[in-house]
């Protein structure tokens, strides 16, 4: 057990040394060979520690039923072979005249440092504390002249460039998990785009087909028109796909581009159209060809496309003395009436009777009779609708 603790301690200390070299706060020059040696030592220490832990019968470390728990190896997004490269393998794969690339360049943990043909592998590498915005490149003249002086190479700041890998280096293939994640992101973006287009088309239809949805403006017959959509106060969140509809405010008006509404933040424009062409597919409401009779209903037997709103009917009420205490006794007038129903009144012991004109078949005139609450000897007669015929001598009711 003491050997296990000692191996663990040495592995952690070697890892701390590598981290200390990488996170140099003073920005000093760190030789690449020293960094490679420290990294290899740390990997070797942890490898020996793993071997000791996995050996259940070695040196009596594990006794009885105690076992080391092994966690299943998760799928890695990056290729694990990049982290196992060593200087010997890289030197064997590269040509003799080409300097061996540093493992840091293979790991791609930091920006790539371009090395020219004249530079040596012993040249120190500056490890930044954070990712720099620019890449450090050695001055080209220092490598071309082939000077053998021991002075450090001159470093200049240049714009970031993309350094291509060597010609013989195979491109690492992405694992299936990473490809599946990219496909999911692309499908989700397409779904969001389709939802936004669907919402915009629905709002366009509602604004065009509504009674008060759109108003036409502009004098020119061939002027271009636009639908103004205001995105000023929209604060979309990713909580649901319908948040875009709740936060989007639409102005249901069609305005000319040369008018006062051209300063809107977002506009959907249509092409040049004539005055006879409907604006943006504006469909006029179809009206039935049949004429309306006095009842307010269409005379056609087919499906009616008229508005179903109830017309405002003018009512007039008069007070007349009651003939008797019977509910059916109502005063006669110049028209004949037929009772078709009655309804109790809240707060009154007497019901309200409903009558329709029976002088001519199909007359839309109606009236209802009820007793006055304050004076039961008086009747309140309310007329509704107009007669569509001349006066006929009424029979006594």
UniProtKB/Swiss-Prot annotation:
It holds the Pfam family Plant_zn_clust. Residues 326-392 bind DNA. One of its GO terms (cellular component) is nucleus. It is found in: Nucleus. InterPro entries: WRKY_dom, WRKY_dom_sf, WRKY_plant, Zn-cluster-dom. Keywords: DNA-binding, Nucleus, Transcription, Transcription regulation. More abundant in apices and young leaf primordia than in fully expanded leaf tissues. SMART domains: WRKY (SM00774). Signal peptide: none annotated. The keyword Transcription applies. Its main location: nucleus. GO terms for molecular function: DNA-binding transcription factor activity; sequence-specific DNA binding. Interacts with RS2. Belongs to the WRKY group II-d family. Transcription factor. Interacts specifically with the W box (5'-(T)TGAC[CT]-3'), a frequently occurring elicitor-responsive cis-acting element. PANTHER family: WRKY TRANSCRIPTION FACTOR 21-RELATED. This is Protein WRKY1. It comes from Zea mays (Maize).
């Amino acid at each position: 057990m003491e050997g296990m603790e000692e191996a663990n301690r040495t592995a952690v200390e070697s890892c701390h040394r590598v981290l200390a070299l990488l996170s140099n706060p003073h920005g000093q020059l760190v030789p690449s060979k020293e960094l490679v040696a420290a990294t290899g030592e740390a990997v070797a220490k942890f490898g020996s520690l793993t071997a000791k832990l996995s050996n259940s019968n070695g040196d009596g470390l594990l006794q009885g039923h105690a076992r080391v728990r092994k966690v299943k190896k998760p799928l890695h997004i990056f290729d694990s072979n990049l982290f196992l490269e060593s200087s010997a393998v890289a030197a064997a794969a590269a040509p003799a005249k080409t300097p061996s690339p540093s493992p840091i360049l293979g790991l791609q943990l930091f920006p790539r440092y371009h090395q020219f043909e004249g530079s040596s592998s012993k040249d120190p590498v500056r490890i930044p504390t954070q990712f720099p915005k620019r890449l450090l490149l050695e001055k080209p003249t220092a490598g071309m002249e082939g000077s053998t002086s021991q002075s450090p190479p001159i470093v200049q700041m240049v714009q970031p460039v993309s350094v291509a890998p060597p010609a013989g280096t195979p491109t690492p293939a992405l694992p299936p998990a990473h490809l599946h994640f990219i496909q999911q992101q692309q499908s989700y973006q397409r779904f969001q785009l389709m939802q936004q287009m669907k919402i915009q088309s629905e709002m366009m239809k509602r604004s065009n087909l509504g009674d008060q949805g759109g108003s036409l403006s502009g004098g020119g017959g061939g002027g271009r028109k636009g639908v103004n959509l205001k995105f000023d106060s929209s604060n979309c969140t990713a909580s649901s796909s319908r948040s875009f509809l709740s936060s989007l405010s639409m102005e249901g008006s069609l305005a000319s581009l040369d008018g006062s509404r051209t300063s809107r933040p977002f506009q959907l424009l249509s092409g040049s159209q004539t005055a006879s062409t409907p604006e943006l597919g504006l469909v006029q409401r179809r009206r039935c060809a049949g004429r309306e009779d006095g009842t307010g209903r269409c005379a056609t037997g087919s499906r009616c496309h008229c508005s179903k709103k109830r017309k405002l009917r003018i009512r007039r009420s008069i007070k007349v003395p009651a003939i008797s205490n019977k509910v059916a006794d109502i005063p006669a007038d110049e028209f004949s009436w037929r009772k078709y129903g009655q309804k109790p009144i809240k707060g009154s012991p007497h019901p309200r009777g409903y009558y329709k004109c029976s002088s001519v078949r199909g007359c839309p005139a109606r009236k209802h009779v009820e007793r006055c609450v304050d004076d039961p000897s008086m009747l309140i007669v309310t007329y509704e609708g107009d007669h569509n015929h001349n006066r006929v001598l009424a029979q006594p009711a």
